[in-house]
């Protein structure tokens, strides 16, 4: 089983947020970053699925060179491979982010074969967007289960567990 999990680098909870001198942006010079909590759950799920069914897991993130910290975190949990998509410092909206991730997935799959499962966190911890995973699934013409709290794989079939209400 080949599992890809996409993670987002977000400001650490409780971090002091400073604004740049011009008042137009967040000053990230002394800001601590972490992996979004929803993606931490997805990383753990990917590792558990590979432990149960064999195969390999890959973590992918886009960001500055410092985002390799989030990739090392995923590797410490047990993810086998890591991919960093370097980006400029410009603002990245969900559409642009999804397009970059889609392109990267297509490139990886053309070289190494398709992923059996692609996991995203339910929403980003910083902006609260629920869009990137949906946009990537649509662009790749893949099925999607939103709000899943876990996955069960039985041969070639999978079931996403979800809590509602």
Which positions does each model-derived feature cover?
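N-terminal glycine-rich FAD/FM-binding segment characteristic of electron-transfer flavoproteins
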Residues: 1-165
